[in-house]
Regions:
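Conserved active-site tyrosine of GNAT-family acetyltransferases
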Residues: 15-20, 93, 117-120
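Short alpha-helical
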Residues: 13-14, 84
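Conserved beta-strand-loop-alpha-helix junction that forms the acyl-donor binding cleft
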Residues: 8-12, 107
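Vicinal oxygen chelate
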Residues: 1-4, 26-116, 127-132
């Protein structure tokens, strides 16, 4: 089994720039209504909010539901094996003023920092295997 996260975004160009230029993702496929981004074993799909229905009966994503906090209750965790690479990425993010929480050693023994993407999705960038 693999995991691919799909995020609905307001501005595809802004989001692609964020994930590609800041976080180092490679654009695998790009179309008007979908972009596939890869970095290592991580696959992110970006789709425009505009392709969702405004409202719908039953469960499912709609533009109406996304008007609240994007990704509420979800933390997207990206792991780097190299602590120096984590520090360099943190400094780059800090220069661009996108940090939510600074790089620090956490009580569970791993370094990480937190940020939000242009659409408000919450990301934690960590060193090592957070699941171990």
């Amino acid at each position: 089994m693999r995991l691919r996260m799909e995020l609905f975004v307001e501005d595809m160009d802004v989001s692609v720039t964020f994930y590609r230029d800041l976080l180092g993702f490679r654009v695998e496929r790009r179309a008007d209504d979908y972009t596939s981004l890869h970095r290592g074993l991580v696959v992110l799909g970006l789709g425009p909010v505009a392709k969702l229905p405004e409202q719908a009966a039953g469960q499912g994503f709609t533009r109406h539901l996304l008007k609240g906090a994007r990704g509420a209750g979800v933390e997207i965790v990206l792991e780097l094996d190299d602590l120096d690479a984590l520090r360099a990425l943190y400094e780059d993010c800090r220069r661009r003023a996108v940090i939510s929480e600074p790089l620090q050693m956490r009580p569970w023994g791993l370094y990480d920092f937190r940020l939000t993407d242009p659409d408000g999705y919450y990301l934690r960038i960590t060193h090592g295997n957070a699941a171990a």
